[in-house]
Amino acid sequence: MSAALESEAWDGDWYIRGISATGAKLGSDSLDEGKIYLEPNVWAAISQTVPEERAIGAMDSVQRRLSTEHGVALCAPAHTKEVPGVGLSLLVFPVGHKENGGIFCHANSWTIVAEGILGRGDRAYQYYRSYLPARYNDSAEVHQVEPYVYCQFTHGPESPR
């Protein structure tokens, strides 16, 4: 597994999401949209199947490219057009919404675990605070729910909302 991840999934600064039916990489820096995805990078760190320096580099890329003041987005930039070999599944949701660049609480939990495994507790805590409901008591309109509720997701930075 480690050899396959290193030879097929490492894109230079992070791990790709996958390879389409036509052989195109999803989550590659060479793309205009969907350059980086959260899940393959946090799970590379959590699974400990990749070299630690690569896991650290991947998580540094997550922080640079996906981290926001409201949590970590699932992908960036969000998709606006069909990806050959994948179809329209990436376009089910609008830009910055849910799986198309939104911020999911459960995926943010994985980010915290990954940083903890890498020994970066301060960064893990920073991620936790970024989507902690009580943090938004003075700006409840951001989540539009009671201040004790963890929403499924928050609109991502590319959302028009």
Which functions belong to the PLM regions below?
Residues M1-R161:
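Acidic, mature catalytic/reactive cores of soluble proteins
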